[in-house]
């Protein structure tokens, strides 16, 4: 009896020590050094023509390393500061000077739900509407998905279904693969819409065999652009290993009412 009590007390002490250690990792109050670094970042980023961007990137990298162990207020202020540099009118750059923006997008993606609002807002910002910013905007969508913030599932799905740019459609649909941990009903809704659009793109690219038909060519190019990322997203969300709109359509018709989180009878590939 005493040995059982002794083991229980030992376990309690160990667990208590673990909890105390975990709690100790979260600072009791905001760090003045973080505040100073954020002020420095703002100053560097606002220098005309991006003359101090390399120094600003160093500051961002230094802060990102500390993010997980920051006080919650510091984490929030950090994400906000990054977002303001990304979206702010005083930090305009030419596309060939985009490294600071790419660094920020990466950092915001790693900041989870604190970073997602700024990624979504920057994607819609007039600052990046010119076609030369397409690839950067695609990166915004990619890292918005990596935040795993469920508030932006609809945002990403809408871009995948409605955006007319092939790159952005592809990136938005591909970013949805990060939501494989969502409940089944959410994943099914995403898959239903993505599969339907995938099939539509495929069908429009095969209405005739005329290689000179510019409309058919446009749809074929679109299918080539979305195929890899959309297949990857559907595979993650369904836990299947199919490829191509025809196979996904058959899978959906056969299994839309089934529990995908349990082993399904394998579909023919």
Regions picked out by a protein language model, each given a short descriptive name:
Residues 28-44, 69-91, 113-126, 149-162, ...:
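Amphipathic alpha-helical scaffolding segments comprising HEAT/armadillo-like alpha-solenoid repeats
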Residues 26-29, 52-73, 94-113, 134-149, ...:
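Structural detector for internal amphipathic alpha-helices that build alpha-solenoid repeat scaffolds
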Residues 96-98, 205-214, 261-269:
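Charged/polar, low-hydrophobicity segments characteristic of intrinsically disordered regions
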Residues 46-54, 84-99, 110, 125-135, ...:
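Short coil turns that connect the paired helices of HEAT/ARM alpha-solenoid repeats
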Residues 15-23:
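C-terminal segment of classical bacterial N-terminal signal peptides
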Residues 235-269:
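Terminal, low-structured helical/coil segments at or just beyond the last alpha-helical repeat
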Residues 1-10, 16:
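Bacterial N-terminal signal peptides that target proteins for export
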Residues 22-41, 257-269:
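Sec-dependent signal peptide cleavage junction
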């Amino acid at each position: 009896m005493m040995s059982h009590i002794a083991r229980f007390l030992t376990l309690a002490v160990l667990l208590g020590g673990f909890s105390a250690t975990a709690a100790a990792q979260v600072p009791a109050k905001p760090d003045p050094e973080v505040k100073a670094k954020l002020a420095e970042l703002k100053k560097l980023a606002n220098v005309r023509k991006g003359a101090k961007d390399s120094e600003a990137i160093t500051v961002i990298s230094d802060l990102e390393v500390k993010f997980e162990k920051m006080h919650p207020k510091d984490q929030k202020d950090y994400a906000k500061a990054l977002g303001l540099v990304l979206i702010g009118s005083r930090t305009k750059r030419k596309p060939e000077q985009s490294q600071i923006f790419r660094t920020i997008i990466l950092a915001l993606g790693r900041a989870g739900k604190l970073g997602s609002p700024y990624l979504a807002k920057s994607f819609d910002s007039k600052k990046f509407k010119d076609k030369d910013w397409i690839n950067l905007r695609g990166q915004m969508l990619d890292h918005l998905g990596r935040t795993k913030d469920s508030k932006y599932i609809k945002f990403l799905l809408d871009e995948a279904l409605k955006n007319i740019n092939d790159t952005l459609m592809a990136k938005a649909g591909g970013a949805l693969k990060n939501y494989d941990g969502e409940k089944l009903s959410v994943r099914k809704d995403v898959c239903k819409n993505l599969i339907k659009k995938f099939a539509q793109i495929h069908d429009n690219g095969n209405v005739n065999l005329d290689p000179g038909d510019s409309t058919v060519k446009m749809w074929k190019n679109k299918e080539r652009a979305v195929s890899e990322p959309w297949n990857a997203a559907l595979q993650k969300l369904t836990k299947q290993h199919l490829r191509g709109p025809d196979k996904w359509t058959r899978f959906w018709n056969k299994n839309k009412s089934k529990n995908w989180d349990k082993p399904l009878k394998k579909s023919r590939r």
